[in-house]
């Protein structure tokens, strides 16, 4: 990271990942080309992250060819005029993580991953979860991404006095 003053610790980065409405997962496809997709991921242990999709398609082919992935999450991106010097900038909170993707084959783990996703994004509809699983488990792919190193975080944020908060300073 070029600007060390904006670096945040891995715990902070995990918070960003948990709060992000989606995380862009970057794959390398079977032809060696980059392929990034915004996906809805969920995790309970901060190491294993799950997403779901169709049983076939480009991302599954990419995982089979190159299971290494990069995750990028952003929770705040606010265009700002710098309070001190009038410069145009962005305030942001972001996280980057690296991991290995694997297509889940065991039904119990598929259900676990889907439950995490549903609990995160549609907790008010958990009463319909079992019916949905019965209807669609056999036609749903679930992928587990296991982080291979702690995520890194970065932010640009100003405090109430217009001073940039650097070196992990919190308000």
Predicted segments with their positions:
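Helix-adjacent hinge/juxtasegments
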Residues: 60-90
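Charged, gly/pro-rich active-site loop segments
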Residues: 2-4, 78-171
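Short, intrinsically disordered, mixed-charge
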Residues: 18, 64-69, 116-123
């Amino acid at each position: 990271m070029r600007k060390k003053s904006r670096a945040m610790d891995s715990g902070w980065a995990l918070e960003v990942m948990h709060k992000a409405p989606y995380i862009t997962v970057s794959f390398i496809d079977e032809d060696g080309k980059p392929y990034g997709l915004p996906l809805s991921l969920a995790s309970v242990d901060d190491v294993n992250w799950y997403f779901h999709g169709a049983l076939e398609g480009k991302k599954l082919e990419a995982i089979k060819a190159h299971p290494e992935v990069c995750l990028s999450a952003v929770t705040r991106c606010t265009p700002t005029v710098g309070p001190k010097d009038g410069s145009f900038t962005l305030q942001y909170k972001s996280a980057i993580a690296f991991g290995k993707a694997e297509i889940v084959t065991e039904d119990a783990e598929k259900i676990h991953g889907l439950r995490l996703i549903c609990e995160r994004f549609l907790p008010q509809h958990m009463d319909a979860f079992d019916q949905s699983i019965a209807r669609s488990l056999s036609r749903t792919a679930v992928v587990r991404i296991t982080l291979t190193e702690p995520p890194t975080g970065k932010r640009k944020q100003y405090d109430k006095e217009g001073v940039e908060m650097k070196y992990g300073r919190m308000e």
